[in-house]
Amino acid sequence: MVKQERSGRTRGNLIRAASTVFDQVGYERATLLVISELAQVTKGALSFHFAAKSDLARAVQAEACTASGALLAQQAERRGPGFDIAVDMAHTLVRLLETDVVVRAGTRLTQEIDTPDDPSVHCHLNWLGSLYRTLRRARTDGSLLPGVDVRPAATLMMSLITGTSSLTRTHTELAFGKSPFSSRESAEQRLTRMIQLVRPALSGP
């Protein structure tokens, strides 16, 4: 039992270390040596758990989907208007992309390596499915306006999430003629402003 627990901790440390490296330099530039050093394990211990870098990357993707998917599932069980729950889901995902390196690395890897169309490892598919199901509920409970197509509505919400996350690290103030040293909106603040723009078209005033 102790040996299994130690093995589980080592595997978890490797996934977190790999996430940090993938997040910082991407898949191609990441090396197993750097990952093992960051995890403070030997190269042999890394090879015991993951035969190749691709296996480690897939484990990061799976962990990212599991962690984020669990939070979305909890929110989906809440009572209340479906549209409001979908908005809360969007805020949760933006927050995770800001604060959780595993989730951030998992989504980056989806763009950098060949990833199967499987929600257990493809976070964007995982999240889009949750948003779609929640907005279908919103259509049923009346919090989504009649006539709104659920599929593009879910895709729009997903685009707000990914767009907000990608722009957060960009000095967008420069595009608006402001100083790069002016105060920057947080990702959630930016998401709130964008949802305020689209809410009337999706859910009404």
Model-predicted segments: where are they?
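N-terminal intrinsically disordered/low-complexity leader segments
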Residues: 1-9, 79, 170-181
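A short His-aromatic
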Residues: 47-50, 54
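Short amphipathic alpha-helical elements of helix-turn-helix/winged-helix folds
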Residues: 17-21, 96, 160
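Hydrophobic alpha-helical connector segments
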Residues: 59, 73-103, 150-157
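C-terminal peripheral helix-coil segments that are non-catalytic and often amphipathic
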Residues: 125-141, 159-205
